[in-house]
């Protein structure tokens, strides 16, 4: 199988072809996703909640991310694999580079970091040293204590303009992908159209270039609160492989996320 690359996603954006991505944390699910053609995966610090049972992503360490990244890479050797740098793993550019090197050696193709213009120097340093970067704006879970909970971000002209400014700054610094989480559809559209790099949405409507879901949300195995943007594809299909195929098909056709999964 031909490897999926950042260039593959750039071509999807140019061709206006939506693409699906998903979180993965272990060998078996990564292998299954790859076999079904779902070839862009994220080892997210969401594993702190979905795998480790914490109430936030904050306890996750670089060692945790590296461990799960290696497992996913063994299951999906040709996927485009993103890995989160967890809380306090990129407080300085130098620290970011050291920790990025750890997860890249474990098998990641790219690191994802949360934050806006304050990260410009870090993004520049990483990209200059051959570490591809995916930005993450909107609801950034590592900042949950500042936000006062998991809330929609970017509502109102001032907040929306700031997120757009952040997105443009990250792109100019060298970021090659951007995740937008829990923002109004209208703002997601503005940002997606303003950037040359692919934008992946989660809770950002169907106007972004791609979509991502936490695998536990996609299969309805998340305990407690279910995010508005989540959809249980396993409930409709009764089979994990069929659920993966349906998720991909609905993203590519624009059916998912629907209005009921979106914010304004």
UniProtKB/Swiss-Prot annotation:
Its main location: cytoplasm. Coiled coil: none annotated. 3-methyl-2-oxobutanoate binds at residues 45-46, 84, 112. Binds 1 Mg(2+) ion per subunit. Pathway: Cofactor biosynthesis; (R)-pantothenate biosynthesis; (R)-pantoate from 3-methyl-2-oxobutanoate: step 1/2. GO terms for molecular function: 3-methyl-2-oxobutanoate hydroxymethyltransferase activity; magnesium ion binding. SUPFAM superfamilies: Phosphoenolpyruvate/pyruvate domain (SSF51621). CDD domains: KPHMT-like. Its EC number is 2.1.2.11. It is found in: Cytoplasm. Mg(2+) binds at residues 45, 84, 114. It catalyses: 3-methyl-2-oxobutanoate + (6R)-5,10-methylene-5,6,7,8-tetrahydrofolate + H2O = 2-dehydropantoate + (6S)-5,6,7,8-tetrahydrofolate. Its cofactor is Mg(2+). Belongs to the PanB family. Catalyzes the reversible reaction in which hydroxymethyl group from 5,10-methylenetetrahydrofolate is transferred onto alpha-ketoisovalerate to form ketopantoate. PANTHER family: 3-METHYL-2-OXOBUTANOATE HYDROXYMETHYLTRANSFERASE. Homodecamer; pentamer of dimers. HAMAP family: PanB (MF_00156). This is 3-methyl-2-oxobutanoate hydroxymethyltransferase. The lineage of its organism: Bacteria, Pseudomonadati, Pseudomonadota, Gammaproteobacteria, Enterobacterales.
């Amino acid at each position: 199988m031909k490897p999926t690359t950042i260039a593959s996603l750039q071509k999807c954006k140019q061709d206006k072809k939506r693409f699906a991505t998903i979180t993965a944390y272990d060998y078996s699910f990564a292998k299954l996703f790859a076999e079904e053609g779902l070839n862009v995966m994220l080892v997210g610090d969401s594993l702190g909640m979905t795998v480790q049972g914490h109430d936030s992503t904050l306890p996750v360490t670089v060692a945790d991310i590296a461990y799960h990244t290696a497992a996913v890479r063994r299951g999906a050797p040709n996927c485009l694999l993103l890995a989160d740098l967890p809380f306090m793993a990129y407080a300085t550019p130098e620290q970011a580079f050291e920790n990025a090197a750890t997860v890249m050696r474990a098998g990641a193709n790219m690191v994802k970091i949360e934050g806006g213009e304050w990260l410009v120097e870090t993004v520049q340093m990483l990209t200059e040293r051959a570490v591809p970067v995916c930005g993450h704006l909107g609801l950034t879970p590592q900042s949950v204590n500042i936000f006062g909970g998991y809330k929609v971000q970017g509502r109102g002209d001032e907040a929306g303009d700031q997120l757009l400014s952040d997105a443009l700054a990250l792109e100019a610094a060298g970021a090659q992908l951007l995740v937008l989480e829990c923002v109004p559809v209208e703002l997601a559209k503005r940002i997606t159209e303003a950037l040359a790099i692919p934008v992946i949405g989660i809770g950002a409507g169907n106007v972004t270039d791609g979509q991502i879901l936490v695998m536990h949300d996609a299969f309805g195995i998340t305990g407690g609160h279910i995010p508005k943007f989540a959809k249980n594809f396993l409930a409709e299909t009764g089979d994990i492989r069929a659920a993966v195929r349906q998720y991909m098909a609905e993203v590519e056709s624009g059916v998912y996320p629907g209005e009921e999964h979106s914010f304004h």
